Regions:
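Non-catalytic terminal accessory segments
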Residues: 1-136
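Soluble catalytic domains of enzymes that build or remodel membrane lipids, polysaccharides, and related
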Residues: 141, 146-397
Length: 397
């Protein structure tokens, strides 16, 4: 949406909230002037992230652009909660009015002002907590995935999953370094980054993504593209990530040998301790580049048939039905952020088959990460960020 229509829409939404809250707060001094100031500041600053894009190419203006982004995104997060809570309040007042008109229920005069104050307080409180949750280093979430027929050599194999970091205007070098330090402390066998790593071009973000070169795992770090890589120039980012030593999987796979098989006499001996780790491009990648159309079947092309443990990295959960049909035992995904903050988690199922956590689809498991960073407003509430440590274990018969 162009900046001008977006600014008009933002202004109209602020007018709606002002009309619904300010009259009710008139009897609560100093709540009324405080609410007015907050609404004015929000209305003025919310469009700033879009305006600040024009500063990105100008190095002298870069600090100003980053400041505008921070202010605007914080306002956006606060207003998002304020808007939803105002709608909920209006629905509650409507139901109370109907109960009064039809059933004779007496609604105290204090309900309107105090409910308006509660909306303001809750939106502010949720935003403050959400800001802290978003800016802290993601916690480690341990997940065991039971795999039928898992070879003994793969029992306990670990994959550290990062997803949806969204390096950009508010996620910078220091934030990434903290993630790298946390992941390296896990001692995982492999590291998987399941897309939406960046929100900007290579020249803008090269320095901030550089710490990823320090990721350490026995079998290396593997990356698949998300939709945001295509917004930011996927081909340039693929080259940059490979320059950093990360292995980008574009509808392809690698075979990971988990122990020394030197001297193996048969194919069974050669592959009994192996794992196929495949990766596909983003579910929507074909809209940006036909050659990048996502294909879980193609990712298994020429995979050793005797290696039955097959793990797929796919940014969006929507890849799961085709992945299950292709014969994978596990798909690791992200994209949803778990909704990031209430109530948006309620809307994720409208677009994705799974929102967060471990799920079963036919004979395949799918794990959906809530994401390691955040997108847009620096705010997480009810959907904590995570570094996921996935451990493969034998399924109980």
């Amino acid at each position: 949406m162009p900046i001008r229509p977006l600014s008009v829409l933002t202004a109209l939404l602020h007018v709606y909230i002002a009309l619904r809250l300010l009259p009710a707060l008139a009897t609560l001094t100093p709540a009324w002037p405080l609410a007015l100031v907050l609404l004015v500041v929000s209305a003025v600053t919310m469009p700033l992230p879009f305006v600040s894009r024009s500063h990105r190419a100008d190095r002298k203006a870069k600090p100003a652009g980053e400041t505008l982004h921070w202010i605007g995104l914080i306002s956006m997060g606060w207003f998002s909660s304020l808007f939803i809570l105002t709608l909920v309040r209006d629905l509650g007042l409507l139901l109370a009015w109907l109960a009064s008109a039809l059933g004779g229920l007496q609604v105290p005069d204090t309900v309107a002002p105090w409910s308006a104050l509660a909306v303001l307080a809750l939106a502010t409180g949720v935003s403050l907590i959400g800001f802290f949750n978003a800016r802290r280093t993601a916690g480690v979430k341990q997940v065991e995935v039971p795999i039928r027929g898992l070879p003994a050599a793969l029992d306990g194999f670990t994959i550290a999953q990062l997803s949806d970091i969204h390096v950009g205007p508010t996620i910078r070098n220091g934030y990434i370094q903290r993630i790298v330090d946390a992941v390296n402390g896990l001692g995982a066998d492999a590291i998987a980054i399941t897309g939406d790593l960046v929100d900007g071009s290579v020249p803008e973000l090269r320095d901030h993504i550089a710490p990823l070169a320090g990721l350490r795992a026995r079998h290396g770090t593997f990356v698949v593209t998300g939709n945001h890589e295509y917004y930011a120039g996927a081909h340039a980012w693929i080259d940059e990530l490979r320059r950093l030593g990360l292995k980008v999987l574009l509808n392809e796979h690698v075979v990971l040998q988990t122990r020394n098989v030197r001297g193996a006499q048969t194919d069974e001996e050669l592959f009994e301790s192996a794992l196929v780790l495949a990766g596909v491009t983003d579910f929507t990648a074909g809209h940006f580049d036909a050659a990048h159309a996502s294909d879980p079947h193609l990712a298994l092309y020429d995979a050793p048939p005797l290696v039955h443990t097959r793990v797929l990295l796919a940014h969006q959960p929507r890849s799961a039905p085709v992945a299950a049909a292709a014969g994978y035992q596990l798909q690791l995904s992200g994209h949803t952020h778990g909704g990031q903050f209430f109530p948006w988690n309620l809307f994720v199922p409208m677009q994705q088959p799974f929102t967060a956590g471990l799920h079963r689809l036919h004979d395949m498991w799918i794990y959906v990460s809530r994401g390691t960073g955040y997108w847009g407003p620096p705010k997480r509430f009810g959907a904590p960020s995570e570094i996921t440590l996935v451990t493969l274990v034998p399924a109980q018969s």
